């Protein structure tokens, strides 16, 4: 199952805003009983200006945009049950989306793109780990961003014979 990582988004708190009301409570004797006079609405004001609200809105929008840009496709190297597999083994990403391959177990793994199963013009050595380089510990990662649309076949060099292969599509 794929996981998506993202940046933390902080949403501003409005707990500092206070309602300003008259400190002197009005009683029936201080309220005009005249039905012909128009009553003024109560004087309520927020101790925050429109400018402050605008700054908060812009900051919130910027946080959301930055968090969206920080999203990445996460692929586990090794399943939770110990199987030698990429999880997911087939997936699709957008052109320019970051892909994070994460070692899910203590087995040594790597990510090598098959030069015969990538779009023409793409250099497999520039997007692959070296076949002798390994992610040895759980949590270690390898990141790649693919910009050329097409299908990409990849494998784990130490476990390719055991069927640890995958395929991704860049749209």
UniProtKB/Swiss-Prot annotation:
GO molecular function: copper ion binding; electron transfer activity
Membrane topology: Peripheral membrane protein
Cofactor annotation: Cu(2+)
Entry GO terms, CC: chloroplast; chloroplast thylakoid membrane; mitochondrion; thylakoid; thylakoid lumen
Chain residues that bind Cu cation: 109, 156, 159, 164
Database matches in Pfam families: Copper-bind (PF00127)
Domain Plastocyanin-like, chain residue ranges per copy: 73-171
Protein's cellular compartments: Plastid, Chloroplast thylakoid membrane
Key words of the record: Chloroplast, Copper, Electron transport, Membrane, Metal-binding, Plastid, Thylakoid, Transit peptide, Transport
SUPFAM superfamilies the UniProt entry points to: Cupredoxins
Gene3D superfamilies in UniProt: Cupredoxins - blue copper proteins
NCBIfam families (alphabetical): cyanin_plasto
Family: Belongs to the plastocyanin family.
Function of the molecule: Participates in electron transfer between P700 and the cytochrome b6-f complex in photosystem I. Seems to be a minor plastocyanin in Arabidopsis.
Protein's name in the database: Plastocyanin minor isoform, chloroplastic
């Amino acid at each position: 199952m794929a996981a998506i990582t993202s940046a933390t988004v902080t949403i501003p708190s409005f707990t500092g805003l206070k309602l300003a009301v008259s400190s002197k409570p009005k009683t029936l004797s201080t309220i005009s009983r005249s039905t012909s006079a128009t009553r003024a609405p109560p004087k309520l004001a927020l101790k925050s200006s429109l400018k402050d609200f605008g700054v908060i809105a812009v900051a919130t929008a910027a946080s959301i945009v930055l968090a969206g840009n920080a999203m990445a496709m996460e692929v586990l190297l090794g399943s939770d049950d110990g199987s030698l597999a990429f999880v997911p083994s087939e997936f699709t990403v957008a052109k320019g989306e970051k892909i994070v391959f994460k070692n899910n177990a203590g087995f040594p793994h790597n990510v090598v793109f098959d030069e015969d199963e990538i779009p023409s013009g793409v250099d497999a050595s520039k997007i692959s780990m070296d076949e002798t380089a390994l992610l040895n510990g759980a949590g270690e990662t390898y990141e790649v961003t693919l910009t050329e649309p097409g299908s990409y076949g990849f494998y784990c060099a130490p476990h390719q014979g055991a069927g640890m292969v995958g395929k991704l599509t860049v749209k």
